[in-house]
Curated annotation (Swiss-Prot):
Subunit structure: Part of the 50S ribosomal subunit.
GO molecular function: rRNA binding; structural constituent of ribosome; tRNA binding
The species this protein was found in: Shigella flexneri
Protein's gene: rplP
Record-linked SUPFAM superfamilies: Ribosomal protein L16p/L10e
Full protein name: Large ribosomal subunit protein uL16
InterPro entries the record matches: Ribosomal_uL16, Ribosomal_uL16_bact-type, Ribosomal_uL16_CS, Ribosomal_uL16_dom, Ribosomal_uL16_sf
UniProt keywords, alphabetically: Ribonucleoprotein, Ribosomal protein, RNA-binding, rRNA-binding, tRNA-binding
Gene3D superfamilies for this protein: Ribosomal protein L10e/L16
Protein family membership: Belongs to the universal ribosomal protein uL16 family.
Pfam families listed in its UniProt record: Ribosomal_L16 (PF00252)
Keyword tRNA-binding belongs to the record: yes
Amino acid sequence: MLQPKRTKFRKMHKGRNRGLAQGTDVSFGSFGLKAVGRGRLTARQIEAARRAMTRAVKRQGKIWIRVFPDKPITEKPLAVRMGKGKGNVEYWVALIQPGKVLYEMGGVPEELAREAFKLAAAKLPIKTTFVTKTVM
């Protein structure tokens, strides 16, 4: 699963997920899966969607993952009283704003790409849409 090799600090503030996304265009492949909603994707969700797409295209074409989980989420154990410091890092998330391209695919027909992205979208907690590369 995806997570940073090393970070400057182990734990992070909760913060807010506001603003608009960068990386809104299909840059590498021909088709993309773009986020319509706002939220956060865990490393497990990113990997589950990648596996669903890979199975659908049966190793033809190429898939690019455009998001990386770089924010640590901490949790305190069950039945532990409040206080006594911040909990341990349990998983990593990527914050997603509307318009962000999450995955890209190239070297496959459009119908196959649509089907693969549909399977991947079912694994994700945010609303997504299918986009194609725009040539200026």
